[in-house]
Amino acid sequence: MIDYKDYIESAYDFPKEGIEYRDIQPLLEDDFAFSMAIREMGELIEEKPTYWVGIESRGFIFASALAMKFGGGVKMIRKAGKLPNTNHTLRGVSYDLEYGSATIEMKPGNGDVVIVDDVYATGGTMEAAERLCEMSGYDVTDKLCLLDIGIKKEHDIKTIISYGK
């Protein structure tokens, strides 16, 4: 069994004082660790979704890799203003972050989805993504992150790396 924490670096007081940033880049750089992480993440999901929904931007990496390995398509949740709204159907949700606020958007559709992101911190992004998927017509069957930094003790997010628990 691989210890994924060996592939995570910490940066203290980034992006602002009091925040400990967990850098997943070393894991992504190692083909064995990355492929094992994708395998283990996918094995946490009992039923294959219609789509893996990646949250901008590193969620795109994991959603794409999971779709390639386990099947299904990829949908993207983008930061506001990054998607064209040519047919005026774009949906958006605003929410608070650990160190600010943001708005995310996606195109509507249907099907079962697993929402995927790299890091789970306060839960704000994942909760907003779930609301956004549901209001856009999707059925959220699961939520998945590579890493839980341990701020929110109780949640229903599946992860393979946990800190603070």
What is the predicted function of each stretch?
Residues 48-56:
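Short glycine-rich phosphate-binding loop at a beta-alpha junction
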Residues 72-114:
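Short, glycine/charge-rich flexible loops or terminal/linker lids adjacent to PRPP-binding catalytic cores
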Residues 50, 111, 141:
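Conserved acidic residues
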Residues 6-7, 127-165:
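PRPP-dependent phosphoribosyltransferase catalytic core
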Residues 117-130:
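Acidic, divalent-metal-coordinating active-site segment for phosphoryl/phosphodiester hydrolysis
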